[in-house]
Design a protein with these regions (language model features):
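Membrane-embedded helix-loop-helix hairpins and adjacent transmembrane boundary segments
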Residues: 1-523, 530, 538-543, 548-562
């Protein structure tokens, strides 16, 4: 127990130290506090984007899904999330340019700048906040699981402890503190998950032997649609689409588009992302699959999300167990801190400042703050504390497994995707039609949550996004909106022929990722993994290569037309 306590305390000390170090480098402006004065270099941007996106869901949720349904979960997440990185250029590059030109910091500010609609701006803030809170709640939930297993402290006490530590270093260091802790925590998570897989597999004679033992009793874990028949081709397609639509709408990811030092950081991040997802996501899923050897059935009252700490407690030495579960804490804290910092900036800049500008005209009525654009620091920080308490309240009585909770959250955010793309690329998009599309979309999310509508053999996100896009397009055409702004995309960076060629290439890649012809194929290959696991790992490499070539083409095209 002493070793475990020392590991956890040491980890907290490092995080708080990074936060205080970042505070000393702060420049004392709102832009610096929230996006580090747009100076984040490419490698740091890549690591903070990854660490922010890979949350408790990545560690605990993926392992739980591996235990429940098998390796069918890996391609959905690895290739689907890697392919999603294409939006780092499609949305990220024009967002970065507009942010730099106009001093934008938050996602709703971008929408307001492009449409001039304060109602649409507030609606974006509301949707992003409402649908981030359940995802935010996953992080203290996972912290409670980890510390309960690690130190034996009560589940909710562990959740509260992690939340307090995270608030301390976030308030001190701002975005600089968050990105530097992301680099530390992301690297720690990757290394220690590799260690965990090696130790657990070693207890069963290596990966090949362990996989053979699992396959004898649970062959469905090595084929699609997976144990329980969850991942039918329609559901598979729905998940693949969901990640591309929802991930760039995470407010904490969206805000990082502004933080890049240059567009090169976004293209570098896009190129490296599929390589990381292809490697990293296999690790927790493998732990979950091997968990069937020790826990064919879970202990009474335990959800599948608990399989990782259960396996570590069963097979790992105390020091390794402490380090790996601390890596899991790293994953969840790197997401939680970013979520709260971004929501803090949105509350300050998209709610408080517009209200102040409208109703408070006399100079000096509201005190100045270096970190919230003219508002008292306690205003945005109090909002963050309130959100953290809401997350803890949800964690106190968790409503579902991480996977179920995440899917609901992601669908709500995906509704915003058509409006963002329309605002960036369609000059005649109507703000009124955009508002209507979001209201209709979130109404459909509620209807699907209540099981009032048919699913058509796929995830709700597919019919919902089709409906919201139709409302947006038809409404804009009927309202005949006048052009509002100049195009945000560098129109000469790629020729129309090149754009068509790239579109065909990525459409073909996405189609290969929906390989319905391989359903039911349970053949195994190297180290006992299903052969199609290696196929999707290869697709992640191909995707990375195509992204790199696209980045080069964009850079060359831009230079040629200067």
């Amino acid at each position: 127990m002493a070793v475990r306590i020392a590991v956890v305390i040491g980890y907290f000390v490092v995080l708080l130290g990074i936060g205080f170090w970042a505070m000393r480098r702060a420049r004392g402006t709102s832009e610096d506090y929230f996006i580090a004065s747009r100076t984040t270099p490419p490698l740091v941007l890549f690591l903070t984007m990854a660490a922010t996106n890979f949350s408790a869901f990545t560690v605990f949720g993926f392992a739980g899904a591996g235990w429940e349904s098998g390796y069918a979960y890996y391609p959905i997440m690895a290739f689907g999330t890697g392919f999603m990185a294409l939006t780092f250029v499609l949305i990220g590059r024009p967002t970065w340019r507009l942010g730099k030109e106009h001093g934008l910091v938050t996602p709703p500010e971008l929408v307001y700048r492009l449409t001039g609609s304060p109602v649409l701006r507030f609606l974006f803030f509301l949707v992003m906040t409402v649908f981030t809170v359940p995802y935010l709640a996953m992080q203290p939930m996972a912290a409670g699981y980890a510390l309960e297993s690690l130190l034996g402290i009560p589940y909710f006490a562990g959740a509260a402890l992690i939340t307090v530590v995270m608030l301390l270093y976030t308030f001190r260091g701002g975005f600089r503190g968050v990105t530097r802790t992301d680099v530390f925590q992301g690297g720690m998570m990757i290394v220690l998950l590799v260690v965990a897989v090696a130790i657990i597999a070693g207890r069963f004679g290596g990966l090949s032997s362990a996989h053979r033992a699992v396959m004898n009793d649970f062959p469905e874990l090595f084929a699609r649609p997976g144990l329980g028949g969850i991942y039918t081709p329609g559901v598979w397609f729905g998940y693949m689409l969901l990640w591309s639509l929802c991930d760039p709408m995470f407010p904490q990811l969206f805000q990082r588009f502004y933080a890049a030092k240059s567009p090169r950081g976004l293209t570098t991040t896009m190129s490296l992302y599929p390589l990381l997802t292809g490697f990293l996501f296999l690790l927790p899923v493998t732990i979950g699959v091997l968990g069937r050897l020790s826990f064919p059935e879970l202990p009474e009252g335990a959800a599948a999300d608990r399989i990782l700490p259960l396996m570590l407690a069963e097979h790992a030495p105390p020091a390794i167990e402490a380090l790996v579960l601390t890596a899991a804490l790293a994953a969840l804290m790197s997401t939680l801190d970013s979520q709260l910092l971004t929501l803090s900036s949105m509350f300050a800049r998209d709610v408080c400042e517009p209200i102040r500008d409208r109703f408070v005209r006399r100079r000096g009525t509201i005190g100045r703050s270096s970190s919230s654009g003219g508002l008292p620091a306690w205003v945005s920080k109090a909002f963050v504390v309130g959100l953290a308490l809401v997350g803890l309240a949800i964690a106190y009585s968790p409503p579902a497994t991480f996977r179920v909770l995440a899917t609901q959250t992601f669908t709500g955010l995906a509704v915003l995707f058509p409006t963002v793309v329309g605002a960036l690329y369609w000059k005649r998009m109507s703000p009124v039609a955009a508002i209507a599309s979001i209201v209709v979309g979130e109404g459909l999310v509620a209807a699907y949550y209540l099981d009032l509508l048919p699913r058509f053999g796929t995830l709700p996100v597919v019919p919902i996004v089709v409906a919201t896009t139709l409302v947006l397009v038809v409404g804009s055409l009927l309202l005949r909106t006048e052009p509002r702004y100049e195009p945000t995309w560098e129109p000469r960076a790629l020729s129309r022929r090149a754009i068509a060629g790239w579109s065909v290439a990525f459409a073909a890649l996405f189609a290969v990722g929906n390989d319905v012809w391989n359903w039911g194929d349970g053949r195994v290959s190297l180290f006992g993994f299903p052969w199609w696991v290696w196929m999707f790992a290869g697709l992640c490499v191909v995707t990375s290569g195509l992204f790199w070539l696209l980045g080069r083409a964009l850079t060359k095209g831009r230079r040629d037309n200067l």
